[in-house]
Amino acid sequence: MTPALKEWSAAVHALLDGRQTVLLRKGGIGEKRFEVAAHEFLLFPTVAHSHAERVRPEHRDLLGPAAADSTDECVLLRAAAKVVAALPVNRPEGLDAIEDLHIWTAESVRADRLDFRPKHRLAVLVVSAIPLAEPVRLARTPEYGGCTSWVQLPVTPTLAAPVH
């Protein structure tokens, strides 16, 4: 089994396209807080919490292609990631300084990351994105559902060269 971090499909595409180099995490509703359970992992594409207004206009071209990677029937794995650094956010006002490292609007970061579960600290994961040599299609099963950050997948795909 291989660990996979659930991440919005548009962010996975942004990582592979070199437009994003960080992941902003607090943990799912079913978790007390986010833990870096693995430093190398697959990226499991999701769209459950996606809305076009959460992405800055210059990155909205990712939404169409990304939506096809996570359907009711299957998911298409395209990427893995390696954590280069995991940094707790102590000063939320400092998030403006990393705006060019992700695709989210400032309002989305505030509402979906900072204001969500305000007692929990936001983690910024600096990652190296690694495309899979060949995308892997998996049937969607109940084990992949729920509001958790991590799932275990029954695949060990071959990786290509890192994007960044």
Give the location of each predicted region.
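Structured alpha/beta reader/binder surfaces that contact nucleic acids or chromatin modification marks
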Residues: 1-164
